Amino acid sequence: MVYNGYLKLNKKLEDNEYMLKIPNYEIQTFFKKGFIDKFLVSSNCFNPMMRALLEGNIEEFERRLQDIFLINTSFHDLKGEKVYHSLFLGMLIWLRDNYEVKSNGERRHGRYDAMLNPLDKIKPAFVFEFKVSKTIKGLTTKAEEALAQIKEKKYDAGLKEKGISKVYRIGIAFKGKNVKVKYEIA
């Protein structure tokens, strides 16, 4: 996809690891119509999931996210945090008309996985951290670790100073097709 121009190298992270980005509006539109609309929106889970997120109904968001993974993914494709990160980031692009969608941004003491910065400051911001659990029983612990990491590393620093009054800190843990979400409002 990089060689064909659908993705662009943004920066090198480590040996053989790179941050990629969608290079322009046309390809973002293609991605939205060709992937999001075709595979996710048609599943009847995607729109309600995004609506639940934006309304702050994180329990419903978690339920719908779980449904998306059960219906639209193959267990064999879900290996490692990068896969979940990419899938989730692809879903967040759907919100780009109202939010600045950021990935792997550096903040204070580390790098958050994803962030939604509202274009309208009366809307909430969302900071996401992802973890992969080795076991289904470990999902809750990993989601709590992800949430703690957001706080400890101050990934949401500066959002309040920008005039954003509500920030959702959301830790998400994955194991195969299983999902667990922990959150708090700052």
Region locations from a protein language model:
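Domain-level recognition of nuclease-like catalytic cores that cleave nucleotide substrates
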Residues: G158, K162-A186
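Extended alpha-helical interface modules used as scaffolds for assembling large macromolecular complexes
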Residues: V2-K154, V179-A186
